[in-house]
UniProtKB/Swiss-Prot annotation:
Top-level taxonomy: Bacteria, Pseudomonadati, Pseudomonadota, Gammaproteobacteria, Oceanospirillales
Range of residues in the leader sequence: none
Biological role: Catalyzes the hydrolysis of N-succinyl-L,L-diaminopimelic acid (SDAP), forming succinate and LL-2,6-diaminopimelate (DAP), an intermediate involved in the bacterial biosynthesis of lysine and meso-diaminopimelic acid, an essential component of bacterial cell walls.
Record text on subunit structure and interactions: Homodimer.
Family statement: Belongs to the peptidase M20A family. DapE subfamily.
Chain sites annotated for binding Zn(2+) 2: D99, E134, H348
Gene Ontology terms: biological process: diaminopimelate biosynthetic process; L-arginine biosynthetic process; lysine biosynthetic process via diaminopimelate
Gene: dapE
Active-site residue numbers: D68, E133 (proton acceptor)
Cysteines joined through disulfide linkages: none
Protein name: Succinyl-diaminopimelate desuccinylase
Length: 377
């Protein structure tokens, strides 16, 4: 069994459901110390984080990821116990196999192999690892980034090991992500008897036209790198449970995934204009999740594309689709950020799995990226 698969199995066997780390970071740290990395422990609250670096000058390439995983769901429905990983017919099963302990293992072994070959390499190699990516993401990467920015730590390039691939390893790499923010809207009416609607104000009826207008609005056209901004209602709650009572208020939650054509303030203004146009009595709370970011083709993207082509003989598609990741926090540093990892078909599902050989190939890709950036100068 390869070193990458051995390490992946060891990491997956540790039940690190957010915000637990279950010893995963200690395992990685031990390996990194052995090849000359300096380790900085950066815990915040209940969350374990660390920043490790090798080298003191030149561009800094950071490998970023998370040791926490989502809950398993009913363990009886797994064909393999989620924290007792096994390779069956060439497929590695276990919670975190794809998201993202397989990537972490590939990163560590890639760096081990690169350092063994180039002990005096140019540049700096770093790791930024958290146990709070799948949860509230309050005390994880965002806190580490803030601390690094306060001391003017420069991270030039970053590879996030999120499972970016769809059908085959390396077919898609994420060179950006849309921005995200949510609204929690409360619309007020007047409770009453359904038989006397003139004595009541139904907040469901009042809110429906405004929500429909937002759902049908054309927010922007997107651009060459981002699809158009999307609006989705995620939850609506109203009523007492009785069929003869007009409710007194309605709560609706919604989310925007927005392109670089708009920002939080512009979208907020348009939402308020729609709500006010419909003469609603309302309160609204906003949750800002992050701005869009984009890494244009250049030194990092070119190094990654070449490494994928050389290793698995395909040319990856550059994409900004999908949800958010911790890359949005790292991008605040002015860092070029790209996500590259395993196939994402089973992430967060029962029987999460990944092709075992693809993790060996992923390690080769990461190592070749290092070669392209630091050994071909």
């Amino acid at each position: 069994m390869s070193p990458t698969l051995k390490l992946a199995l060891d990491l997956i066997s540790r039940p690190s459901v957010t915000p637990e780390d279950a010893g995963c970071q200690d395992l990685m740290i031990e390996r990194l110390k052995n090849i000359g990395f300096e380790i900085e422990y950066m815990p915040f609250g209940e969350v374990k984080n660390f920043y490790a670096k090798r080298g003191n000058s030149g561009p800094n390439l950071c490998f970023a990821g998370h040791t926490d995983v989502v809950p398993t769901g009913p363990e009886a429905e797994w064909k393999i116990p989620p924290f007792a990983p096994e390779i069956v017919d060439g497929v590695l099963y276990g919670r975190g196999a794809a998201d993202m302990k397989g990537s972490l293992a590939a990163m560590v072994t890639a760096v081990e192999n690169f350092v063994a070959k180039h002990p005096n390499h140019s540049g700096q190699i770093s790791f930024l690892i958290t146990s709070d990516e799948e949860g509230p993401f309050v005390d994880g990467t965002t806190r580490v980034v803030d601390a690094l920015m306060e001391r003017n730590e420069q991270v030039d390039w970053c590879i996030v090991g999120e499972p970016s691939s769809t059908k085959t390893l390396g077919d898609i790499i994420k060179n950006g992500r849309r921005g995200s923010f949510s609204g929690d809207l409360t619309v007020y009416g007047k409770q009453g008897h359904v038989a006397y609607p003139h004595l009541a104000e139904n907040p469901i009826h009042l809110a429906a036209p405004a929500l429909a207008e937002m759902a049908s609005s054309h927010w922007d056209d997107g651009n060459d790198f981002f699809p158009p901004t999307s609006f989705q209602v995620s939850n609506i709650h109203s009523g007492t449970g009785a069929t003869n009572v007009v409710p007194g208020k309605l709560n609706a939650q919604f989310n925007f995934r927005f392109s670089s054509e708009l920002d939080f303030d512009a979208l907020k203004v348009r939402v308020i204009e729609i709500l006010d146009k419909h003469n609603l009595r309302y309160d609204i709370e906003w949750t800002y999740n992050g701005l869009p970011f984009l890494t244009r083709p250049g030194e990092l993207v070119d190094a990654i594309v070449e490494a994928v082509q050389a290793t698995v003989n395909i040319t990856p598609e550059l994409s900004t689709s999908g949800g958010t990741s911790d890359g949005r926090f790292i991008a605040k540093m002015g860092t070029q950020v790209v996500e590259l990892g395993p196939i994402n078909a089973t992430i967060h599902q029962i029987n999460e799995c990944v092709d075992a050989e693809s993790l060996n190939q992923l390690s080769e890709i990461y190592a070749r990226i290092l070669e392209n950036l630091f050994a071909k100068k």
